[in-house]
Amino acid sequence: MGENIEISTKVIENQEIRFRCYKADSTKIAVLAHPYAFLGGSVDDINIIALSKKINSKGFTVYVLDATTRRSALLSGKHDTMIFTLFVKYITSLNHPEYLLLGGYSYGARISMHKSITLAIDKRISHVSYLFLAPYLGLGSSILSWSWGLGFESFSTDSKVLFVWPDNDEFTREGTFETTLAKLKNRCPETTPLKLTDCSHMLSPSSRKILLETVDKWLASALNV
C-alpha cells in the first residue's frame, strides 16, 4: 500500500523537500502534487495513491511531493510551486529520464500547471507529458496557487496531456473546465479529455475505476509504455 511507504527527505538549494517515492525504472519519472494541505490534502489521499500505483505499474518511478509541512499556511501556493520547481529541476538533471510525467489532483493539479515548473525541466528530456485530475480552477485559484494564467504557453506543443474533470465538481464549474480544456488543446493538440459523469470532486469508487482504466490505456497509447 502506498500509505505504508515511508516519507523521504531531500535538501535542495537549502529547501527541505519531503516526498513519497514509488520506485521503478529511473528512465521514466513522474512527479505528482496532492490536494490542498490546508484542507487536509496529503500524500495519503486515496486518489493520489491510486494514481501513483497505476503509473508505477507502467514502469515509472513516481514521486509525490509532500506539502503538509505547511498545512497551517492558508496561502501556500508560492512555496508549493517553488518546491515542485526545485524538485523537478533536481530530479531531471540527476537522472535525465527519457519520459517525464507531471501533474496532480485538485489544487495539486493547478500547482503543476505553473510555467516555472515546465521551464525547470532538463532540455535533454524528449518526452514530457501531463496528467491533470480535477484541477482546482474555481474562485481564488490563481491566488491560492500563486499563478496568474495557466502556464500552458510554456508546454511543448507535442506534449501528451490527459485532462480529467468531474461533471459535478463542487469547486470548479464545468464551463471553466471546458474553457481550460479548449486552451490546452489549442496549445497541445494531443490532449485527451475525460469527463467523469455523475461524479463529484472526491471521485466515487466507480469513477476512480474509470479513471485508472483510462490512465492505463493513455499511458500505453500516448506514451507507448
Swiss-Prot record:
This is Uncharacterized protein C959.06c. It comes from Schizosaccharomyces pombe (strain 972 / ATCC 24843) (Fission yeast). The lineage of its organism: Eukaryota, Fungi, Dikarya, Ascomycota, Taphrinomycotina. One of its GO terms (molecular function) is catalytic activity. InterPro entries: AB_hydrolase_fold. It comes from the Eukaryota.
